[in-house]
Swiss-Prot record:
The N-terminal domain determines nucleotide recognition and specific binding, while the C-terminal domain determines the specific binding to the target protein. It comes from Pseudomonas syringae pv. syringae (strain B728a). Monomer. Its cofactor is Mg(2+). Its EC number is 2.7.7.77. It is found in: Cytoplasm. One of its GO terms (biological process) is bis(molybdopterin guanine dinucleotide)molybdenum biosynthetic process. It catalyses: Mo-molybdopterin + GTP + H(+) = Mo-molybdopterin guanine dinucleotide + diphosphate. GO terms for cellular component: cytoplasm. GTP binds at residues 15-17, 28, 74, 104. It comes from the Bacteria. This is Molybdenum cofactor guanylyltransferase.
Length: 201
């Protein structure tokens, strides 16, 4: 019987610092789904995987603190997008890799996170990014913390897109089928309700 090789430790970043425009300005990570806040679903999944769990949040700091080892905030109040949270977390990560997840993907499972970490072990110098069909998902992946300075330089040059900021580093795809249900992005009230109804059938 083959025992899977142990995977190197990683820091984990949960992105919850957005404006929540599609949710009417509500703090998305704290919206309840299936009896718990979205951030709590991801906390349950990721807590056993790391001793360095980081949440990027820009409001409700006290509520998020219970779910993380550390919190990071953007350095201004303009809600500049997920790259702001990534650049804040990368220099602080305690491990070689930073695994990144947005707060609104509660159907992501342990098998997907393991696949990301296995791919990272194969390509230790390059970012790993989920690709669903032909579409990249730049907020689902892993970044070597050694690239913190590169992303910071992109930020200072005016780049705000995680995909474009990572492009020069030649991301490696973790290929998934189009429509993989684990990637359901519950970022509107209708999607939250629809997924809940489907799971309860």
């Amino acid at each position: 019987m083959n025992v899977p090789a142990p995977l190197p430790p990683c820091s984990i970043l949960l992105l919850a610092g957005g404006r929540g425009q599609r949710m009417g300005g509500r703090d998305k990570g704290l919206i309840e789904w299936q009896g718990a806040a979205l951030i709590e679903h991801l906390h349950r999944l990721t807590r056993p995987l790391t001793d360095d769990l980081i949440i990027s949040c820009n409001r409700n700091i006290d509520r998020y603190a219970r779910y993380a080892d550390r919190l990071v905030q953007d350095d201004d109040t303009d809600f500049n997008g997920p790259l702001a949270g990534i650049r804040a977390a990368l220099p602080l990560a305690r491990h070689r890799w930073l695994l990144i997840l947005p707060c609104d993907v509660p159907l992501v499972d342990a098998a997907l996170l393991r696949a990301l970490r296995e791919k990272a072990s194969e390509y230790p110098e390059r970012p790993i990014m989920v690709r669903e069909g032909q579409h990249w998902q730049p907020l689902l992946g892993m970044i070597p913390v050694a690239h913190a300075a590169t992303l910071e330089a992109a930020w200072q040059a005016g780049e705000r897109s995680p995909r474009r900021a990572l492009e020069p580093l030649q991301p490696v795809a973790l290929q998934l089928e189009a429509g993989d249900p684990r990637l359901a992005n519950l970022n509107t009230p209708c999607l939250l309700t629809g997924i809940s109804e489907n799971r309860n059938k």
